[in-house]
Swiss-Prot record:
Residues in the signal sequence: none
InterPro entries associated with the record: ERT1_acuK_gluconeogen_tf, PAS_13, Zn2-C6_fun-type_DNA-bd_sf, Zn2Cys6_DnaBD
SMART domains membership: GAL4 (SM00066)
One GO process term, biological-process aspect: gluconeogenesis
Keyword Transcription included in the entry's annotation: yes
Name of the protein this chain belongs to: Transcription activator of gluconeogenesis acuK
Predominant location: nucleus
DNA-binding region: 65-93
Gene: acuK
Length: 683
């Protein structure tokens, strides 16, 4: 075999011609000629036959080089490959460009490299990088060649910066990411100021990875380079993906999700971007000492993500004659409370860093001091130290850090903490007494025939009430009331946000919540409906059953003196039956008996007549002839504004409406409340 090897050398050297002779048939003919020249009579080895199935096959390369790819020949994994060495093309031997699928057309070529042998960014390489004198780590990729394969980056991603984490301490960061292991919740404004002053003359440590050692601006390149694996700060080789493009996409989503808490808090700059230009200003508020970040929107070099604490609040020397306008100095803290609602859902904004990632609430939130505040706007502490400069230059707007700011309410607002619901409810609700009050009201107002119809409807669901409540003890009844109050707490926000006239009442028919639009439509005040003010209504819609036999049934609905004396000072909400005329009340209780324990998702859509709130003076005024002209005007020209809504039904005391209502049940599957939406049918 040594003779065969020596004889094959001229054949390899003669392969530099333009004719390619690397096919298996040509190799067989060459070996047969060598055997004849040496005078041997032995046949060619069995393995030299290309069609022999026992012949060892050459291992397929993961990616062919450019020359072998164009010649459609078998290549190897080594670079340069053996064929390029034979042809003298070892200097130009590099991986060929593989045709990509349609969904990978926007992927860089380097991201599709299979295997884990490429020179991608990883944590092991980053931890072994030596530091230079100015804090930057320089790595030459030409000196780190992997024995398996090499990655040839695209020209646009020839160099990029990698921020190291080993030599940096906590004092080097003005703020830290809450997801990092070294995040400290007890960072004081003084410590933040000291860390900022110590890092003024320092440059951010960077690692330049390129073909030659060079220094470039990390933000002078493209807006976002997806071929930069160091952008995602994790080892892509350890990810279980078929190609690196999937790992890059996964890392992008994770980076966007975890980096939202450290974005700059300056709302005056461009949204979603941040600059590192010479016009960046840095100031400190006189009250909290918290740093404020501001910049001129004119000179701005945006970068994609702001999760690096060194870049969020990067300090620079303040330009002379450059004024600062602090938002807390222009807008008083008490005057901004109409925007900082305590009853709004507490969430972490994208452009503000949360103090913690725990579930926010109205009492634990560091931004808002919830509760009642009787102080007026004049007594609110106002920061007026930062203002416009006298030279007339346009000031740079800065926003102080909200982490150390305690906002106070300048107006009295209702406390919107759901925890108060569970703390305030101590006794179960007296549904039995309320049903007795409802029965007494129905007997006083309605005729015997209509009273019998309502009684039959309520009697049909009475056994179901008894069956569902007989196993409930006192604690269950208290918990039932807590469920009602907690559900009502949610519905009050919906009522305020919805422009449709809406009322919410208990299963007894007592009004529990009402919207402003319903009060405008019917004239019933909210405090009157909830029982906080006396009910002076005398409008009952008249008797719908002529000849009922009782002349004492006028238009006045008196309160039972025995019931009022039994519960002195207790609010007496208005019943839903007091808001409807006789026929509408009968129809309502017949539908309620069907939905109370029937279809839990069912609803009723029908028409009704709502009774206007009228006192004795209103009833006397309605009898005059002047109002007839107003009613004719409503029929012809319609209504306009709130004043026109108040005049609906002023003559006869009834407003024709269409309403939709449904029944909500509690955890014991008992009817808990009734939600009703009303729409006027005046046109």
């Amino acid at each position: 075999m040594k003779t065969e090897d020596n004889g094959s050398a001229p054949a390899l050297a003669g392969d530099h011609g333009g004719v390619d002779q690397d096919t298996p048939d040509a190799g067989d003919r060459t070996e047969q000629a060598k055997h004849k020249t040496n005078g041997t009579t032995e046949k060619a080895p069995k393995s030299s036959n290309a069609k022999d199935p026992s012949r060892p096959r050459r291992k397929k390369a993961r990616r062919a080089c450019f020359a072998c790819q164009r010649a459609h020949l078998t290549c190897g994994d080594e670079r340069p490959c053996q064929r390029c060495i034979k042809r003298g093309l070892q200097d130009a031997c590099h991986d060929g460009v593989r045709k990509k699928a349609k969904y990978l057309h926007d992927a860089p070529d380097g991201a599709l490299m299979p295997g884990v042998g490429g020179n991608f960014y990883n944590n092991a390489m980053r931890n072994n990088l030596p530091l230079s004198r100015n804090g930057a780590t320089t790595v030459n990729t030409t000196s780190q060649q992997n024995s398996g394969s090499s990655y040839y980056p695209t020209p646009q991603s020839n160099s990029y910066n990698v921020y190291q984490d080993t030599p940096l301490t906590q004092n080097s960061f003005p703020s830290q990411s809450p997801v990092s292991p070294t995040f400290n919740m007890k960072t004081t404004p003084t410590a933040r100021s000291n860390s900022l002053s110590s890092s003024v003359n320092q440059q951010p440590p960077n690692t330049t990875v390129s073909g030659a050692t060079q220094s470039q601006n990390p933000f002078a390149g493209p807006f976002f380079d997806p071929s930069d694996p160091a952008l995602f700060n994790f080892d892509l080789s350890s990810m279980n993906f078929e190609n690196r493009y999937g790992a890059l996409e996964f890392g992008m989503l994770g980076h966007m999700a975890t980096g939202a808490g450290d974005s700059p808090t300056d709302s005056a700059t461009q949204r979603g971007s941040m600059g590192r230009s010479g016009s960046t200003q840095y100031s400190t508020t006189p009250i909290t000492g918290a740093p404020g970040f501001g910049e001129s929107p004119g000179n701005q070099q945006p970068f994609m993500f702001g999760n690096d604490p060194l870049l969020n609040e990067w300090p620079n020397s303040q330009a002379p004659n450059q004024g600062h306008l602090n938002v807390s100095g222009v807008y008083p803290q008490g005057g901004m409370m109409h925007m900082a609602k305590s009853d709004a859902p507490h969430a972490f904004a994208i452009e503000s860093g949360p103090a913690s990632f725990s579930s926010p609430s109205a009492t634990t939130s560091p931004h808002i001091n919830s509760g009642y505040d009787e102080s007026s706007l004049s007594n609110t502490v106002v920061n007026k130290s930062n203002g416009l400069t006298a030279n007339g230059q346009r000031p740079a707007i800065t926003t102080p850090s909200l982490k150390h700011q305690s906002l106070q309410f300048g107006v009295k607002r209702r406390q919107r903490n759901p925890s108060t619901v569970y703390e305030s409810v101590k006794e179960p609700y007296a549904y039995t007494n309320r049903f007795h009050n409802l029965t007494a009201f129905i007997q006083r107002r309605f005729s015997p025939q209509k009273t019998l119809q309502i009684a039959k409807a309520l009697a049909s669901i009475r056994p179901s009430f008894i069956a569902t409540t007989k196993t409930l003890n006192r604690d269950d009844l208290i918990f039932m009331e807590k469920c009602f109050q907690r559900t009502l707490w949610e519905y009050e926000d919906f009522i305020n946000a919805c422009g449709t006239p809406t009322i919410v009442c208990r299963r007894t028919g007592e009004i529990a919540a009402v919207g402003k639009e319903f009060s405008i439509l019917t004239g019933w005040k909210k405090d009157v409906l909830l029982g906080k003010e006396p009910n002076l209504n005398v409008n009952t819609g008249g008797s719908s059953a002529p000849g009922s036999g009782t002349t004492s049934r006028g238009s006045f609905t008196p309160r039972s003196s025995t019931l009022e004396n039994a519960t002195p000072g207790r609010p007496q909400p208005v019943f839903l039956a007091e808001l409807l005329d006789d026929d509408s009340v009968v129809e309502f209780y017949e539908d309620f008996a069907r939905l109370a324990f029937g279809d839990s998702r069912g609803s009723v859509m029908t028409t009704c007549k709502l009774l206007k709130y009228k006192t004795k003076e209103d009833m006397e005024l309605a009898q005059s002839d002047d109002n007839q002209r107003w009613n004719n005007h409503l029929r012809k020209g319609g209504i306009a504004g709130e004043a026109g809504m108040n005049q609906l039904g002023f003559k006869d005391g009834k407003v024709e409406c269409a309403y939709c209502w449904t029944v909500k049940r509690d955890v014991f599957d008992i009817p808990m409340l009734i939600v009703m939406n009303v729409s006027c049918q005046c046109f």
